């Protein structure tokens, strides 16, 4: 195996600016990133923890010969060895999202939506709740007996859209699959890990129904004299799934229940999300563990604690390791009280 095909550790500061995510909070830098000084940052709504997107590309922290290189360029040099397949397709985009205020009420189209612009695609995603304030929650799907006409009437009146939706109080560990056509919003005080599925060289599309009547200044700060964010009423109405379940029945249909893979005295291994092309496993506890690539690109994201691998290479809270498919097995030692996610991009990871 050539030297450059060892796992790479990514820079942990791939943050969006406040103007892009004006609803952001401060927990990402204060609670979820070891070794980053919160005083250097203000509001941070998103950290793109694994990204090949040119807008916010992941960059390498180590090894030294790849330092600050774009991860996309590193993979492109030997795609078969990194990805484990010949198609060169990586669908995963991984974000950590912290909502200081509620996000807009929105919906994503499917890839089959005829009005998608060139260079864009649908954006199936999922949420794994990692922190929340007391009583905080999400909005997910349409409430009982709500019709398209009800939503249109609320929009016409400039009324609060929340009564048309299901508010779901959350707990740490809750997981939800957000399929195309699902109306949704993350509520204030909720922090989630969000894996998304996007096409290479395309941007996932979000259509906003409503943004809670907010206006913003140029820097992304709330300003009653400012400008509202763009809404996409007609597209949002067109792609919403109006048929099917409502209310609590819909919420439960979107909830993903973890499956225990292995349980040791000091370590729990679970499958916590399955999005088809991408699956997400969780390791919680301490001790030695062989993380297998399953012949596909593998992403390890540390939620808490830390791990050591190789020649004393360390990854701590908020850090990401990307393991090439060809690597086979990463022998890792987890610190006490470590919590990490292992994400597989490809059919072998399911």
Question: For the regions a protein language model found, what residue spans apply to each?
Answer:
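Acidic/His-leaning functional-site neighborhoods
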Residues: 250-319, 326-327
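Short histidine-centered beta-strand/loop micro-motifs
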Residues: 85-86, 95, 116-119, 288-294, ...
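His/acidic/aromatic-lined binding-pocket segments of jelly-roll/cupin-type domains
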Residues: 94, 103, 125-128, 167-168, ...
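Loop-centered beta-sheet repeat module
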Residues: 156-214
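Transition-metal
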Residues: 1-147, 211-254, 280, 348
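Ligand-binding loop in jelly-roll beta-barrel domains
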Residues: 98-102, 111, 121, 132-135, ...
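Intrinsically disordered, low-complexity linker/loop segments enriched in Gly/Pro
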Residues: 111, 131-179
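Short acidic-glycine-tyrosine-enriched beta hairpin
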Residues: 165-177, 310-330
């Amino acid at each position: 195996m050539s030297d450059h095909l060892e796992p790479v550790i990514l820079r942990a500061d791939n943050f969006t600016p406040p103007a892009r995510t004006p609803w952001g909070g401060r927990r990402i830098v204060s609670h979820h990133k070891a070794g980053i000084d919160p005083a250097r940052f203000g509001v941070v709504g998103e950290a793109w923890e694994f990204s090949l997107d040119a807008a916010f590309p992941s960059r390498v922290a180590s090894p030294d010969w790849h330092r600050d290189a774009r991860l996309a360029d590193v993979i492109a040099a030997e795609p078969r060895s990194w990805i484990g397949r010949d198609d060169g397709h990586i669908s995963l985009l991984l974000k950590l999202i912290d909502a200081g205020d509620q996000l807009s009420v929105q919906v994503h189209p499917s890839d089959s939506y005829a009005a998608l612009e060139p260079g864009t695609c649908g954006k199936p995603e999922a949420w794994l709740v990692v922190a929340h304030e007391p009583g905080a929650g999400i909005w997910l799907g349409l409430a009982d007996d709500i019709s398209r006409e009800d939503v249109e009437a609320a929009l016409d009146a400039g009324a609060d859209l929340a009564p048309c939706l299901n508010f779901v109080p959350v707990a740490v560990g809750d997981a939800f699959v957000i399929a195309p056509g699902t109306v949704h919003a993350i509520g204030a005080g909720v922090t989630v890990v969000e894996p998304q599925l996007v096409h290479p060289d395309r941007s996932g599309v979000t259509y906003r129904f409503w943004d809670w009547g907010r206006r913003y200044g140029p820097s992304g700060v709330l300003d009653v004299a400012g400008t509202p964010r763009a809404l996409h009423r007609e597209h949002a109405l067109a792609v919403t799934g109006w048929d099917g379940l409502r209310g609590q029945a819909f919420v439960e249909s979107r909830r993903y229940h973890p499956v225990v893979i292995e349980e040791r005295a000091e370590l729990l291994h679970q499958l916590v999300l399955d999005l088809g092309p991408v699956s997400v496993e969780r390791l919680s506890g301490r001790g030695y563990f062989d993380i297998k690539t399953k012949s596909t690109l593998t992403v390890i994201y540390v939620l808490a604690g830390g791990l050591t691998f190789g020649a004393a290479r360390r990854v701590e809270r908020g850090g990401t390791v990307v393991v090439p498919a060809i690597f086979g097995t990463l022998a890792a030692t987890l610190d006490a009280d470590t919590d990490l996610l292992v994400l597989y991009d490809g059919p072998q990871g399911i």
